[in-house]
Amino acid sequence: MSKIYDWFEERLEIQAIADDISSKYVPPHVNIFYCLGGIVFVSFLIQVATGFAMTFYYRPTVAEAFTSVEYIMTDVNFGWLIRSIHRWSASMMVLMMILHVFRVYLTGGFKKPRELTWVTGVILGVLTVSFGVTGYSLPWDQIGYWAVKIVTGVPDAVPVVGESIVELLRGGVSVGQGTLTRFYSLHTFVLPLLTAVFMLMHFLMIRKQGISGPL
């Protein structure tokens, strides 16, 4: 094993990278509330893992969506557990994100020179809420259907372009298969990709600038 490690070490300088990560200075004022962002990240990873597992059985069609969710809950081995963990971690992600925003705001973590870190964090907050909105509709039950109908109908109040936005979100004039397909694509591909990109930016800026000082 040592020869293999030495081979990689010679080319990638693994030890130098590990030392840089492990030796990063942590200010003495940091407490447990500074871990809230990390909990959001862990919740996101759980979401990705459990969501990916469910894509093997979920069918994003109006006729089969609800039945496929029932199948996951009743017939798939540990399907009930995987979906439950997905739901619980989703709630945890939203809650921890809200608490994280409050912590950053109350400790002044949004001030110069960390404005861009704050902006990426706000974008991540919007993406987190979008996860909830799109995921809520995927079982395509009565609650999901009417939630989608209400949410996608909100932009109709926007002057001039409101009707076009509604049709874009719904994939047509009314809520149907086009809507479910759009929400499924957003929930499983677009939003995770955007979240991963902005999380990387967020972490790199925190790594560069360090944790903000006490008030």
Swiss-Prot record:
One of its GO terms (biological process) is photosynthesis. Its cofactor is heme b; heme c. One of its GO terms (cellular component) is chloroplast thylakoid membrane. Its main location: plastid. The keyword Plastid applies. It comes from the Eukaryota. GO terms for molecular function: electron transporter, transferring electrons within cytochrome b6/f complex of photosystem II activity; metal ion binding; oxidoreductase activity. Heme c binds at residue 35. Heme b 1 binds at residues 100, 202. Heme b 2 binds at residues 86, 187. The 4 large subunits of the cytochrome b6-f complex are cytochrome b6, subunit IV (17 kDa polypeptide, PetD), cytochrome f and the Rieske protein, while the 4 small subunits are PetG, PetL, PetM and PetN. The complex functions as a dimer. Belongs to the cytochrome b family. PetB subfamily. Heme 1 (or BH or b566) is high-potential and absorbs at about 566 nm, and heme 2 (or BL or b562) is low-potential and absorbs at about 562 nm. This is Cytochrome b6. It comes from Porphyra purpurea. The gene is petB.
